[in-house]
């Protein structure tokens, strides 16, 4: 049985909508990042709707790592190497954990600046057109079964090519028949040689539609923006029982799409982040 917080269906009656929060009885937690026409946009520090996050007792990832999984032959630049978009994403991850854009979350439960890396795995087999959540989990497990490192402090980010879309239940990303979200993060249990691990992962489908693109952003910038959002949320609320507000919104949900995504440290794409310290959205830590 799933407990689902869904306000997306009531867009004609409400001035804004929220992230779709899905908590299952097996401990799996999923948070869908809405398209830009479905986001709340709290904006100004101390402004209307400035409702701080509360801590609900669950774990955070105090010293996180990032790992990119590029799924499909489309990530080939034609010479057998990763293309420019994938290469830029690795550059983004290699510096993200030390930026002010990341350090803003250190106010939550002792989270530290992260040693995010540019480690990756490239699976050149092509994914199906519709990549369900179970298929995405199977792809992460495929990496593990091929000798990949199993680590419960790593966020495994799976990048999909433009020939595929992501689906979770009846909701889809760009390219699917029921467009609702641009990306999401979740978790699952994996039995490794060193015991059961709580694996954190994110689905990063290709931002091929207007609802998941920001004016002036390149495709890589849009990916970076979503990776920023999903990585920080997977760190501050990995299992759905740590940091979120009374409506179920996690830190990045409260600043999704408004204020406007921006080009920040290193020229990469970022999202504003909720700060309890100022009761509003900020670009970086002070």
Annotated model-derived regions:
Residues 4-13:
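Sec-dependent N-terminal signal peptides
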Residues 15-19:
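Sec/Tat signal peptide C-region and signal peptidase I cleavage site
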Residues 21-140:
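N-terminal carbohydrate-binding/catalytic regions of secreted carbohydrate-active enzymes
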Residues 47, 59-64, 145-153, 166-167, ...:
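Extracellular/periplasmic catalytic domains that process cell-envelope and extracellular macromolecules
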Residues 65-70, 103-107, 154-160, 200-205, ...:
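Structural recognition of the beta-strand scaffold that forms the well-ordered cores
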Residues 72-76, 110-113, 162-167, 206-211, ...:
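Solvent-exposed loop/turn segments at secondary-structure junctions
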Residues 114-190:
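Active-site-proximal segments of metallohydrolase catalytic domains
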Residues 175-221, 237-286:
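Metalloprotease/metallohydrolase-associated module, dominated by Zn2+-dependent proteases
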């Amino acid at each position: 049985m799933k407990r689902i917080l869904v306000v997306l269906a009531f867009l004609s009656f409400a001035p804004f909508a929220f992230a779709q929060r899905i908590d299952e009885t097996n401990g799996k937690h999923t948070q869908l990042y809405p398209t830009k026409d479905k986001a709340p946009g709290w904006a100004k520090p101390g402004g209307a709707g400035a409702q701080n996050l509360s801590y609900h007792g669950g774990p955070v990832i105090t010293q996180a790592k990032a790992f990119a999984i590029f799924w499909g032959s489309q990530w080939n630049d034609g010479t057998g190497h990763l293309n420019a978009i994938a290469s830029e994403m690795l550059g983004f991850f290699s510096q993200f954990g030390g930026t002010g854009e990341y350090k803003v979350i250190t106010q939550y439960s002792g989270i530290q600046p992260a040693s995010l890396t540019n480690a990756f795995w490239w699976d050149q087999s092509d994914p199906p057109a519709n990549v369900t959540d179970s298929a995405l989990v199977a792809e992460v497990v495929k990496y593990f079964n091929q000798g990949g490192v199993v680590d419960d402090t790593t966020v495994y980010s799976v990048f999909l090519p433009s020939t595929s879309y992501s689906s979770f239940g009846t909701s889809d990303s760009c390219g699917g028949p029921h467009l609702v979200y641009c990306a999401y993060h979740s978790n699952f249990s994996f039995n490794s040689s060193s015991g059961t691990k709580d694996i954190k992962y994110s689905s990063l489908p290709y931002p091929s539609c207007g609802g998941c693109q920001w004016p002036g952003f390149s495709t890589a910038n849009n990916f970076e923006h979503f990776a920023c959002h999903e990585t920080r949320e997977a760190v501050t609320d990995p299992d759905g029982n740590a940091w979120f507000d009374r409506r179920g919104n996690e830190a990045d949900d409260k600043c999704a799409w408004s204020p406007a995504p921006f080009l920040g440290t290193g020229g990469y794409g970022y999202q504003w982040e909720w700060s309890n310290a100022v009761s509003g959205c900020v670009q970086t830590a002070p």
